[in-house]
């Protein structure tokens, strides 16, 4: 029976490269001269430290542009609240979304059911498996899910016929 898996994963090497490029650009830009802006990767979160809210926003814009250039979806980033750090610094934690949560999996399953195609979806840990008798139905499910804005970065893998 044909099937495929829906997963949400991020290439950590590309994330590391994007962060390194961001740090390099911050060091070279004139508007960041003399500032103490930092971007660090800690397991599955990114810590951004800046002098003020304006510089924090600028650093995050640079980071997002580097992510897009490296084919990492901005949907895979979850932004925490900007908070005061030591001194006059501002800190923001950005979490990388790896895996599909149970709530998102249920939401995706509901979207699949609404298509009224003859396919079944089942939640397996942090991924979703979709099976059906017809490959065309599975391709239609992929098309529908790509068209929906579900606020999650999805990849479709293990397409078996």
From Swiss-Prot:
Keywords: Nucleotide-binding
Source species, domain of life: Bacteria
Pfam families referenced in this protein's UniProt entry, alphabetically: DUF520 (PF04461)
SUPFAM superfamilies: YajQ-like
InterPro entries to which the protein is assigned, alphabetical: DUF520, UPF0234-like_C, UPF0234_N, YajQ-like_sf
A GO molecular-function descriptor: nucleotide binding
GO cellular component, one term: cytosol
Known function: Nucleotide-binding protein.
Database matches in NCBIfam families: PRK05412.1
Family: Belongs to the YajQ family.
Name used for this protein in its record: Nucleotide-binding protein GM21_0633
Biological source species: Geobacter sp. (strain M21)
